[in-house]
Amino acid sequence: MFASIWQTRAVGVLIGCLLDVVFGDPKRGHPVALFGRAAAKLEQITYRDGRVAGAVHVGLLVGAVGLLGAALQRLPGRCWPVAATATATWAALGGTSLARTGRQISDLLERDDVEAARRLLPSLCGRDPAQLGGPGLTRAALESVAENTADAQVVPLLWAASSGVPAVLGYRAINTLDSMIGYRSPRYLRFGWAAARLDDWANYVGARATAVLVVICAPVVGGSPRGAVRAWRRDAARHPSPNAGVVEAAFAGALDVRLGGPTRYHHELQIRPTLGDGRSPKVADLRRAVVLSRVVQAGAAVLAVMLVYRRRP
């Protein structure tokens, strides 16, 4: 039915994008949630306060997911490779749920329903919302929308397009493990080291591709491409994450807002450097960030298909 593996992959990636746009994440039985529960169970066996134990934990889980992806991709049938690629891409994407949550938080903040916004924030990021007021919730949500534009949208598409089902499932496993154990808390400082470093590697190229797309797409929301480039070049390296800083700085410059500052997690308070030199973000800026994030995802889908066809022999 399809002339080559490259056409199969391109069609599968596009169908996966469409599934995410139409359905978003399933409320029950999401593969990522199932993986997370399995990882938590395995941690009860593998946990030791050391880097080697953490590397073994990550290697077992990512290796198992990668092997599963390779097996799914090689099952016989003319349509199966397309279905496998589409399903894996859909499972790895989270753009629709990200946008929905960002909009819901902006709606709540616009109505001054701070308590409800606090309850919703943990579904978007790992911040501690208990001490955040409206401005703090707005900044936390905007920063999370920016960072997850890469993690939940652009990077999975690029892995799916470049290397197929094993790679996109492996990427999602790495990213999920980083969100579970990649913290500098007393428990995970050493055990989570491998997950955090592997996530840095897996996102390195994709985060910069995301920033480029932010620059290109900024005018859609009345943003500044020049401001995005300026903030990216000047501020990104000051962020503690080599990848999140790139994307957050580009968003800050594009939207002419100022991000960073005191950032409270459940296990620590971080004083992060300032990204961008604009105003403090308002609820309207959060709405613009959500729209920009969706436009960037569309651009990433186009980029992914171009990448597939560029790799054709």
UniProtKB/Swiss-Prot annotation:
Coarse class of the primary localization is membrane
Which GO cellular component terms, listed alphabetically, does the Swiss-Prot or TrEMBL entry include? plasma membrane
Q: Which GO terms describe its molecular function?
A: ABC-type vitamin B12 transporter activity; threonine-phosphate decarboxylase activity
The GO biological-process annotations, alphabetized, read as: cobalamin biosynthetic process
Does the record bear Cell cycle in its keywords? no
In the bilayer, the protein is annotated as: Multi-pass membrane protein
One Pfam family from the record = CobD_Cbib
| Cellular localisation | Cell membrane
What pathway, per the record?
A: Cofactor biosynthesis; adenosylcobalamin biosynthesis
Tell me if Isomerase is a UniProt keyword of this record. Answer: no
Question: What keywords would UniProt list here?
Answer: Cell membrane, Cobalamin biosynthesis, Membrane, Transmembrane, Transmembrane helix
Per the UniProt record, which residue ranges are transmembrane? 52-72, 79-99, 154-174, 204-224, 289-309
Q: What does this protein do?
A: Converts cobyric acid to cobinamide by the addition of aminopropanol on the F carboxylic group.
* Stated family: Belongs to the CobD/CbiB family.
Q: What is this protein called?
A: Cobalamin biosynthesis protein CobD
